[in-house]
Design a protein with these regions (language model features):
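Residue-level detector of anion-binding/catalytic polar loops
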Residues: 84-85, 130
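Conserved acetyl-CoA-binding loop-helix of GNAT-fold acetyltransferases
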Residues: 63-80, 86-88
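Conserved acetyl-CoA-binding loop of GNAT-fold acetyltransferases
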Residues: 125-134
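Conserved beta-hairpin
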Residues: 1-12, 27-28, 126
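Short alpha-helix
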Residues: 118-126
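Conserved acyl-donor/pantetheine-binding loop and adjacent beta-alpha core of acyl/acetyltransferases
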Residues: 12-54, 92-117, 135-136
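Active-site acidic-Proline motif in GNAT/NAT acetyltransferases
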Residues: 57-60
Length: 136
């Protein structure tokens, strides 16, 4: 959560899930991550990974880098809690502009600097993330 004079301007959340670190073992998306988190908790299976679920920034505070601040805070807290990995089943911001392009192709498009054409993927890449694959 990011505060500005006592008002919440940005925040986010994630769920702890067990994950082997193998791309083939990734949750298939938001719903699967949440189901895995609940099932693992109920079965006493320890989590190894934080799956980001959402980040929100108030529209009056957009374009100030607050999403990155929230993601960094969640990542820090995940590591402090002993989680080894952080994953983000994200929805690329500009994918709707290219409805006929398969997600895996879209996610591979890069600018001359080597970063994704998509601003939300780029935000994660600047934090050290890499695209592991599209959700089914």
């Amino acid at each position: 959560m990011v505060l500005d004079h006592g008002a919440v301007v940005a925040g986010g959340w994630g769920v702890p899930v067990p994950w082997s670190g193998d791309a083939d073992d990734l949750p298939s998306g938001y719903d699967d991550a949440l189901v895995r988190a609940v099932q693992a908790r109920e079965a006493g299976i320890p989590a190894t990974t934080l799956s980001f679920m959402a980040v929100a920034v108030g529209s009056a505070h957009d374009k100030r880098g607050l999403a990155t601040v929230v993601l960094q805070g969640l990542t820090r807290r995940a590591h402090e809690a002993g989680l080894v990995h952080v994953i983000a089943p994200l929805r690329p911001t500009w994918k709707h502009r290219y409805p006929m392009v398969p997600m895996d192709e879209y996610a591979a498009w890069v600018r001359p600097d080597g970063l994704s054409i998509d601003p939300w993927i780029r935000t994660h890449q600047r934090m050290g993330a890499r695209v592991l694959g599209p959700a089914p």
